[in-house]
Amino acid sequence: MTDESWPMVEEAVFRLFDELAAKDAGEHVAVGPRLAELGWSDIEAEYPIEACQLLFRAQGRSLAHTDCLDRVMVAELAALLDEPVDGIVLPDLVAGYTPGSDSDRVAGIVLGPLDGRLVVPVSGAMGAVSVGVIEADRLTGQRLDTFDPSAYWTQVSGPLDVALVDASTEWNRAIAAAHRALATELVALADQTLRIAVDHVKVRVQFGAPIGSFQSPRHALADASAVLEGARALLGESWRYGGRLSAQTAKAAAGRAHRAVADAALQVSGAIGLTAEHELHRYVTRGFQVDSLCGSYLQLEALLGERLFDIYAPGRPLPAIVTRAED
């Protein structure tokens, strides 16, 4: 594959996710078989970062519900797993990115219906994490009443009596991968939200002129766009250099940027933007829903602040968000 062929890959993936969103609206889709038809393993091998980014750009753009997040996190834990799994039990929303399960009991969230074999991360002493695998039919699940009504999330609980293996390092990598992936989806959702608002102010006429010609709407959208571009730049650095802290910061920035764009878009769109018939609310509610996974931007900002205060001392520099490898 050449760099010239990458736009064709993007087009194919965008088209696939648009089809999934249209055909399987409201359903949680295992996207692996459809990606295999595109030769995804070869694409991932040649463009590992760009391929992962593309999936979450496409998901945010299309509003499809897929198992992409499970795929990304399980890939970081794969070396510890003896057999293939179908998903992962994510931490409860109030727990941020700390697993809610312990050595005796499963507690957390599954994206989609409760089915198949699931990886269960388990919190231990001093921040340690271990993982086990359990059959979904041994757990109890209840569909959550989500802010985005199209999202299918399941609250799961049940006894845990399977073998556990230490996975502290692998779990940190999985959470960092999740933060980058979710941040990418949030930026894509914010892009679509901003596009809708800009299109609206171009055609909505008040006082004999498009409202986009007035200073207040222009400045509100420009300010939101600036916040979004800052988050996009930080996210790009996190993808480029990796690291847990940079991923956490990128997701916090992306969540805050989506909120800023949503606030501005709802303001300039007026009452029409709140109606079920208008598409704006779909990108707003989906963004709020996605932001809550693995730590909302408010939770992550609080954790980042606590870390800075814990390590601060007079004369000591702040920690680097991005650390470049030495040449």
Describe the role of every protein-language-model region.
Residues 45-48, 66-73:
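Active-site nucleophile and cofactor-binding loops and adjacent substrate-binding regions
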Residues 69, 76-195, 315-327:
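FAD-binding core of flavoproteins
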Residues 73-76, 275:
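Generic structural signal for helix capping and beta-alpha/helix-loop junctions
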